[in-house]
């Protein structure tokens, strides 16, 4: 009986925060393509609007970016930052694995955080993880 109660409490503790967590609406792709094509086509067109940044900064596989790269990253518009976040940084290609190192070296890590609108800084996931761990530990003792 105690095992069943512990199992139910464990599931309630782990699952409940996921039910009460607010969900963000899906973000539309921010692209330069206004021809009315499908979202998938527009997402693939977005990197074409910023080839210089991708080529000079992320495609080099070098953690030490050039001055030109840093200048481009620092002067990028909000539209370009959103495009890079949605297509290169958030969904990295194996060729672009150095995005965080390049952004950090150029001093623009905060600008390219890609989820700056989330003000809790991942606290929800930490709470869920700690509650799940508590449930596992509690189930060992009861």
Curated annotation (Swiss-Prot):
Q: List the disulfide bonds.
A: 46-85, 57-69, 70-106, 83-114
* Region span, Disordered: 21-43
Q: How does the protein associate with the membrane? A: Lipid-anchor; GPI-anchor
Ligase in keyword set: no
Location(s), subcellular? Cell membrane
Record's InterPro entries?
Bifun_inhib/LTP/seed_sf, Bifunc_inhib/LTP/seed_store
Annotated Low complexity bias? 29-38
Q: Which UniProt keywords apply?
A: Cell membrane, Disulfide bond, Glycoprotein, GPI-anchor, Lipoprotein, Membrane, Signal
Which residues comprise the propeptide?
121-142
What does the entry list under GO cellular component? plasma membrane; side of membrane
Q: Where is the lipid attached (GPI-anchor amidated asparagine)?
A: 120
Question: Signal sequence: where?
Answer: 1-22
Protein purpose: Probable lipid transfer protein.
Q: What family is it from?
A: Belongs to the plant LTP family.
Put simply, this protein is called: Non-specific lipid transfer protein GPI-anchored 34
What organism is listed for this UniProt entry?
Answer: Arabidopsis thaliana (Mouse-ear cress)
Question: What's the name of its gene?
Answer: LTPG34
């Amino acid at each position: 009986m105690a095992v069943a109660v512990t199992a139910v409490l464990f599931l309630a503790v782990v699952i409940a925060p996921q039910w009460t967590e607010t969900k963000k609406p899906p973000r539309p792709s921010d692209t330069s393509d206004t021809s009315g094509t499908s979202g998938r086509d527009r997402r693939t067109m977005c990197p074409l609007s910023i080839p210089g940044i991708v080529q000079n900064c992320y495609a080099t596989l070098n953690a030490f970016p050039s001055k030109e790269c840093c200048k481009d990253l620092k002067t990028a518009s909000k539209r370009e930052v959103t495009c890079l976040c949605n297509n290169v940084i958030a969904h990295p290609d194996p060729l672009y694995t150095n995005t965080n190192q390049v952004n950090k070296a150029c001093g623009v890590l905060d600008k390219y955080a890609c989820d700056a609108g989330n003000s809790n800084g991942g606290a929800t996931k930490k709470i869920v993880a700690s509650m799940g761990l508590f449930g596992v530990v509690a189930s060992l003792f009861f």
